[in-house]
């Protein structure tokens, strides 16, 4: 099982996300990543292979990533070998390396679980002009959310709902939308997720 966390509030998100991921560790993960955003700025994605401490060192314990809204992930490889490209977060845009640094993408997300019909969904998205850079089912899931978001223009909740209708599997999902700064959208099916609210700040794990 992978670990996913999210935070939006007044504090800097990255140190909180790293601490949250450390509490979820229970075996040897192969990679980790964060996506953090400050206001209307683009989300910035940082990934690292190896242990969570490698990501912490790469970001100076989160201090090099400015932003009060973000998501994080530790990966145990299922689809795709351990690599920076296969590490989460994944992005909806056709970005080389599947998103690193500031990303222009409409949707950035992390996911825990298995998408059983990801190959079928990937073929659908390829027909609609999407390109893929990782071997993960997560990249397919994020780009499917993007597809419905742009097709129906009805907002994040409707896009995620339509995605869940098409997806088979057990999963938990966290996504951020470029058009909705300071917000994290979550969904789950048969996978655990908890949301906590305290002092006007929101935590997800």
Positions of the model-derived regions?
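Conserved short alpha-helical segments that host acidic/polar catalytic motifs at enzyme active sites
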Residues: 1-205
């Amino acid at each position: 099982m992978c670990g996913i966390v999210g935070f939006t509030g007044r504090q800097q998100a990255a140190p909180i996300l790293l601490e949250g991921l450390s509490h979820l560790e229970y075996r040897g993960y192969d990679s980790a990543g964060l996506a953090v955003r400050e206001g209307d700025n683009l989300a910035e994605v940082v990934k690292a292979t190896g242990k969570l401490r490698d990501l912490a060192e790469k970001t100076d314990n989160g201090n090099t990533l400015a932003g009060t809204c973000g998501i994080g992930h530790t990966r145990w490889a299922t689809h795709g070998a351990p690599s920076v490209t296969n590490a989460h977060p994944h992005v909806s845009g056709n970005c080389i390396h599947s998103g690193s640094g500031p990303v222009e993408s409409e949707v950035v997300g992390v996911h825990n679980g298995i998408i059983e019909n990801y190959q079928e969904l990937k073929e659908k998205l390829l027909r609609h002009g999407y390109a893929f850079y990782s071997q993960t089912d997560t990249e397919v899931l994020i780009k499917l959310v993007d597809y419905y978001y742009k097709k129906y223009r009805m907002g994040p909740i409707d896009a995620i709902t339509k995605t869940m209708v098409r997806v088979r599997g057990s999963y938990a999902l966290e996504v951020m939308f470029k058009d909705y700064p300071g917000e994290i959208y979550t969904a789950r099916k048969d996978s655990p997720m908890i949301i906590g609210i305290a002092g006007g700040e929101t935590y997800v794990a």
